[in-house]
Amino acid sequence: GKIKKVPGSFASLATTLFLFFLFHILNIFPNIILFSVIIIFFISLYAVDIFIKDLTNKDPKEVVIDEFIGQSIPICLYEIAHNIPKETDQILKFYFIMFILFRIFDITKPYPVSYYDKNFKNSFGVIMDDVCAGLYVVAILVLYMIFI
């Protein structure tokens, strides 16, 4: 979060690379990581509230755990849904698509992403807008798998 330009994009990219390493180098089960992300979500609700308590900006750029959580959702669910070996180039293509889509939804904030961003000036709003952006990515991937 201390990177001056586009810290959210850097956090999302770092998350994407980190998850690729966990899933495809260390071969960690995606269910374990998804469960960990859920735990991190609840811990972050508390931790982010403490961090932003005295700040006027309730969604500071220094807080990037929300990008980690939001970017992790589609990647973990992709890995759970595709539990068969795939070629690395195909996996990297989908990871890249998930990264780009997440950034688009996180930046443009279509409803309900914008709803959480505007109406909850607390840790719940900080994190839930990214969770919704991640769920939009999941929805697009599901539609892709159904129709293509």
Predicted feature residues:
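Interhelical loop and helix-boundary elements at the membrane-water interface
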Residues: 1-12, 46-74, 103-135
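Hydrophobic alpha-helical transmembrane segments
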Residues: 6-14, 31-42, 69-89, 92, 96-100, ...
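Helix-coil boundary and interhelical linker segments in multi-pass alpha-helical membrane proteins
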Residues: 19-34, 75-94, 142-148
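Alpha-helical transmembrane segments of multi-pass membrane proteins
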Residues: 20, 37-46, 70, 79, ...
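Short hydrophobic interaction/assembly module
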Residues: 28-55
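Final/C-terminal transmembrane alpha-helix of multipass membrane proteins
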Residues: 130-147
